[in-house]
From Swiss-Prot:
This is Probable tautomerase SMU_1087. Keywords: Isomerase. It comes from the Bacteria. Its EC number is 5.3.2.-. Coiled coil: none annotated. Disulfide bonds: none annotated. The keyword Isomerase applies. InterPro entries: 4-OT-like_dom (IPR004370), Tautomerase/MIF_sf (IPR014347). It comes from Streptococcus mutans serotype c (strain ATCC 700610 / UA159). The active site is at 2 (proton acceptor). GO terms for molecular function: isomerase activity.
Length: 61
């Protein structure tokens, strides 16, 4: 049962997230030979100010 977690900065529309989840599901199903019903995609909208690579705050854009 594949679980796919995607962290993105906030700002994508619901339609974009739906398309992303569908396309990720297609690829995982094809490559991992897993039934689509067994694939779970989690999309986490990260507010600005919550990501600090190398100790520095990453801003959108």
């Amino acid at each position: 049962m594949p679980f796919v977690k995607i962290d993105l900065f906030e700002g994508r529309s619901q339609e974009q997230k739906i398309q992303l989840a569908r396309e990720v599901t297609e690829v995982v199903s094809r490559v991992a030979k897993a039934p689509k019903e067994a694939i779970h995609v989690f999309i986490n909208d990260m507010p600005e100010g919550t990501y600090y690579p190398h100790g520095e705050m990453k801003k959108k854009g």
